[in-house]
Amino acid sequence: MSVLKLKNADFENEILKKEGIALVDFYADWCGPCKMLAPVIEEISAERPDVTVAKINVDEEGELASKYGVMSIPTLIIFKNGEENERIVGFKQKRAILSML
């Protein structure tokens, strides 16, 4: 499954109204750790087709980042059945992220 690039308008239908697990990466193009995390997110998306994986650019979707209290990037939020379940701030290795899904 490919990584979804979400806008505020898509977030509710793609993440909040879906059953199952979703991994949402809040990032910015200029962020070094975000760039390091990008291939890890792609790998997780390929390895875990049962998980909805999405990216949200905080520079373009500041309202959504603010709504979820994203203060540092990268921030990964894991949703289960539309509810926030876990939060990871900063770069993490793939195995650490997978263990939280």
Residue ranges and their predicted role:
Residues 3-21, 62:
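A short beta-strand-turn-helix
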Residues 22, 62, 68-77, 95:
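Structural micro-motif
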Residues 77-101:
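Non-catalytic, surface beta->alpha helical segment in thiol-disulfide oxidoreductase systems
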Residues 19-21, 38-56, 60-62:
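Conserved helix-turn-beta segment immediately C-terminal to the redox Cys motif
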Residues 26-39:
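Conserved redox-active cysteine motifs that mediate thiol-disulfide chemistry
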Residues 2, 7, 27, 54:
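Conserved Rossmann-like nucleotide-binding pocket used by diverse enzymes
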Residues 11, 24, 41, 57, ...:
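Residue-level signature of catalytic and energy-coupling elements of molecular machines
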